[in-house]
């Protein structure tokens, strides 16, 4: 899957925010923009998923925030990765198929 959202982390791995490729695309090849910090493009994610959060809690966050991709962090806000709503739904679908067989 192609990803359009990227994490911005500090030297300790803490999540500072996210950057959406669509927000960068227009400026990516403009030499006058090369010196600009990534923080100029950074936004806060709609929410974060804690690494030990229940699937039910994760799905509620996806529904509440009307989003398909959220960052996963540990208790110290260190970035661990992204999780997508579609990946969870696909895994759920696979489990249903196994149960029905």
Predicted regions mapped to residue ranges:
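Glycine-rich acetyl-CoA-binding "A-motif" of GNAT/NAT acetyltransferases
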Residues: 15-18, 78-82
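Bateman (tandem CBS) regulatory domains
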Residues: 20-23, 34-46
């Amino acid at each position: 899957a192609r990803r359009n959202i990227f994490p911005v982390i500090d030297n300790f791995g803490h999540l500072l925010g996210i950057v959406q490729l669509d927000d960068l695309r227009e400026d990516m090849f403009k030499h006058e923009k090369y010196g600009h910090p990534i923080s100029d493009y950074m936004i806060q994610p709609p929410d974060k998923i804690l690494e030990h959060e229940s699937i039910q809690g994760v799905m509620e966050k996806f529904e509440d925030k009307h989003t398909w991709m959220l960052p996963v962090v540990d208790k110290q806000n260190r970035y661990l990765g992204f999780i997508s709503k579609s990946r969870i739904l696909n895994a759920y679908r696979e489990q249903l198929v196994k149960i029905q067989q």
